[in-house]
């Protein structure tokens, strides 16, 4: 938030919201408290949707590296080509 405040002080044009109204960054910064976000309750739009607890298995089995396991690729050997006999006398 402090970065926004310093950027907005250097700007000549005021910041505007979606409706085009100017935003007073100094007032917004003073109203902001770091504890506000931690005390807000989660609002679920769909009450039928359950909340899943975090599980280490959700990482894809890679030990938390964030990669999905790659499927094993089975390949077949290339067919052997027949040797072509060249006629040396033909030009």
UniProtKB/Swiss-Prot annotation:
Keywords: Host cell membrane, Host Golgi apparatus, Host membrane, Lipoprotein, Membrane, Myristate, Palmitate, Phosphoprotein, Virion, Virion tegument
Membrane association type: Lipid-anchor
Keyword Membrane recorded: yes
Disordered: region residues: 48-81
Subunit structure of this chain's protein: Interacts with cytoplasmic envelopment protein 2; this interaction is essential for the proper localization of each protein to the assembly complex and thus for the production of infectious virus.
Protein known as: Cytoplasmic envelopment protein 3
Compartment annotation: Virion tegument; Virion membrane; Host cell membrane; Host Golgi apparatus membrane
The family this protein is said to belong to: Belongs to the herpesviridae cytoplasmic envelopment protein 3 family.
Compositional bias annotation for Acidic residues: 52-62
Function: Plays an important role in the cytoplasmic envelopment of tegument proteins and capsids during the assembly and egress processes. Also participates in viral entry at the fusion step probably by regulating the core fusion machinery.
Modification after translation: Myristoylation and palmitoylation (probably on one or more of the nearby cysteines at the N-terminus) enable membrane-binding and Golgi apparatus-specific targeting and are essential for efficient packaging.
Pfam families: Herpesvir_UL11 (PF10813)
GO BP field: viral budding from Golgi membrane
Taxonomic lineage of the native organism: Viruses, Duplodnaviria, Heunggongvirae, Peploviricota, Herviviricetes
Disulfide bridge map: none
Species this chain originates from: Equine herpesvirus 2 (strain 86/87)
């Amino acid at each position: 938030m402090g970065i926004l405040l310093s950027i907005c002080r250097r700007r000549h044009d005021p910041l505007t919201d979606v409706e085009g109204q100017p935003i007073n960054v100094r007032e917004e910064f003073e109203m902001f408290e770091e504890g506000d976000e931690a005390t807000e309750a989660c609002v679920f739009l769909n009450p039928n949707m359950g909340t899943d607890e975090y599980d280490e298995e959700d990482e894809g089995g890679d030990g938390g590296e964030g990669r999905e396991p790659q499927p094993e690729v089975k390949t077949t050997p290339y067919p052997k080509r027949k040797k072509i006999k060249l006629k040396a006398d033909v030009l």
